């Protein structure tokens, strides 16, 4: 029993001595690390203060493998002084001279410094700046051209102004069902005529009527015609009139332009004529109450649409006939089946 106790006490003493030895080793390692760090910090401070006297790069040697492992561990950040020591002295001197030449006092010599930096720019940057200047000028010129009105564009129609001497009443001529458009258009002349395709029962044509009635007074040197598209269906098909109201500008007997704007007011019509022909409107011409009366009506006319009546009658007759023939159709189908069986 005593022998066992002595053995256990011996084991405990050995363990305690080993632990003390490990603690002493660890303390010595920590002290060595602190000394190394202090030395490195002093070296980095001296190098940062005097970069021209930085020592040559030398490999760092450690006393023991444990200290080397501790210093080269991944959790310890790399010391910048060590990295600086690896840079050659010629490169350091060049960087220092460049930094000193580029440093400028912004509070005292700000203007002079900016001029100096501009002079020190490379030739490529100056060439780029010079090349960007004409590009900006061209972009500004394009923007100004796009902002100009259509009046600066070349005229599409060169209208010959008609002689208005002796004419006091300028109005719209309306074609009846017996007249032809070509009777009013002269193919051998360069005079321009504005032709309106309309229908009396269309409310859009009625809304345009007072503004179109005002145009002959605003443009006395032009001709103005209006025709009922339902009565002149051949002309509507010939000139591509699929909806009314439709306005075409003719030069002689040739259609030159079509009015496609949704705003069918007097100002829009004036702009259309001016942009196409270059003829300016007479100033001071406005829509009056008389323009709502004639020659084009300002209210849609109420009448009988005989085409619609004929269509309704035709559909009704077809339905009655199909109903009466239902029984005969039923008898035909079984007869055909018997023929196939025989």
Swiss-Prot record:
Superkingdom of the organism of origin: Eukaryota
SUPFAM superfamilies (UniProt xref): Thioredoxin-like
Record membrane topology: Single-pass type I membrane protein
Region (Disordered) residue spans: 120-156
Main location: membrane
Bias-annotated ranges (Basic and acidic residues): 120-145
Residue intervals on the Cytoplasmic side: 323-342
Entry GO terms, CC: ciliary membrane; cilium
Keywords assigned by UniProt, alphabetized: Cell membrane, Cell projection, Cilium biogenesis/degradation, Glycoprotein, Membrane, Signal, Transmembrane, Transmembrane helix
Signal peptide bounds: 1-21
Keyword Membrane set for record: yes
One Pfam family in the UniProt entry: Thioredoxin
Extracellular side: 22-301
Residues annotated as glycosylated: 169, 176, 188
Transmembrane residue ranges: 302-322
GO biological process, one term: cilium assembly
Subcellular location: Cell projection, Cilium membrane
Stretches assigned to the Thioredoxin domain: 173-276
Free-text function comment from the UniProt entry: Acts as a positive regulator of ciliary hedgehog signaling. Required for cilia biogenesis.
Protein name according to UniProt: Thioredoxin domain-containing protein 15
Gene it is expressed from: txndc15
């Amino acid at each position: 029993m005593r022998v066992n106790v002595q053995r256990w006490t011996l084991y405990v003493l050995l363990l305690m001595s080993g632990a003390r030895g490990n603690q002493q080793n660890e303390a010595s390692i920590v002290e060595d690390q602190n000394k190394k760090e202090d030395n490195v910090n002093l070296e980095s401070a001296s190098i940062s203060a005097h970069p021209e006297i930085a020592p040559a790069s030398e490999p760092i040697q450690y006393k023991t493998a444990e200290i080397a492992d501790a210093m080269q561990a991944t959790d310890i950040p790399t010391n910048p002084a060590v990295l600086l020591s690896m840079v050659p002295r010629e490169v350091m001197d060049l960087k220092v001279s460049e930094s000193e030449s580029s440093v400028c006092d912004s509070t005292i010599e700000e203007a002079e410094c900016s001029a100096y930096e501009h002079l020190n720019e490379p030739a490529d940057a100056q060439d780029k700046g010079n090349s960007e200047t004409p590009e900006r000028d061209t972009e500004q010129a394009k923007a100004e051209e796009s902002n100009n009105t259509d009046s600066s564009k070349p005229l599409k129609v060169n209208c010959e102004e008609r002689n208005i001497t002796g004419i006091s009443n300028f109005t719209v001529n309306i074609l009846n069902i017996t007249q032809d458009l070509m009777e009013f258009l002269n193919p051998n002349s360069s005079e321009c005529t504005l032709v309106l395709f309309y229908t009396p029962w269309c409310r859009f044509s009625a809304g345009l009527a007072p503004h179109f009635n005002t145009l002959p007074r605003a443009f006395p040197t032009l001709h103005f015609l209006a025709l009922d598209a339902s009565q002149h269906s051949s002309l509507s098909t010939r000139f591509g009139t699929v909806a009314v109201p439709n306005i075409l500008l003719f030069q002689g007997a040739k259609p030159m332009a079509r009015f496609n704007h949704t705003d069918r007011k007097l100002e829009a019509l004036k702009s259309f004529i001016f942009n196409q022909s270059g003829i300016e409107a007479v100033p001071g011409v406005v829509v009056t109450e008389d323009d709502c009366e004639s020659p084009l009506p300002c209210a849609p006319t109420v009448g009988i649409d005989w085409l619609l009546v004929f269509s309704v009658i035709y559909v009704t007759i077809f339905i009655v006939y199909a109903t009466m023939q239902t029984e005969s159709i039923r008898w035909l189908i079984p007869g055909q089946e018997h023929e196939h069986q025989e």
